[in-house]
Amino acid sequence: MYSFNASHSGSLDFGVMLAGGTYRLCWCSGMTMTGCAPADFQTDVGELTILGPFERQDRTCIAGVSCSVDAFDGLGLDLGHDRFMILSTCGVPGGSGGFGFGIRLGDVVTWESLSAPGGEYRLCWCYVFPNITFNASGGSSLSPGNESLPDCTVATDFLVDVGRLLL
């Protein structure tokens, strides 16, 4: 949902974390008695490209040993900034998941040891943003950190569900 304030700046909230891909942006005027139901978004206003892994990329590993799986397909994936975590539910701490970070080296993602019991888990992704800030003149500069961006160190940072891991 897009909303704006008196200074004409705005934000766009999709309500869900989208997987990598290209999406159509559609508009509804909101001039109906019911507001904007999904079927009312009939006007195509452009394209939105989300960088990240594609959905439904399932993998299998053996419990108790190092796990290496083929790297994930997606748009704009970055060897130096992609992080993967195995969780019971993406973005939710606790439960029986949470195996630390998968390290992407070239065409594989590796976890040192998977000691959880056999079962089905979720492969979750987070992108570590470089410490860059942008200013109004169009330039950029390095910054000591940005509190609004995830640092991909805790389960709640890993919101994008890439697929399932059978262990």
Model-derived regions: residue spans:
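Hydrophobic beta-strand core residues of beta-sandwich domains
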Residues: 17, 61-64, 103, 115
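Surface-exposed, short loops/turns at beta-strand junctions within beta-sandwich domains
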Residues: 15-22, 113-120
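Extracellular recognition modules
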Residues: 24-28, 122-126
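Beta-strand/beta-sandwich contexts
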Residues: 34-94, 132-167
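Aromatic sugar-binding surface patches on proteins
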Residues: 1-13, 97-112
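Intrinsic low-complexity tandem-repeat regions in disordered proteins
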Residues: 14, 45, 120-121, 162
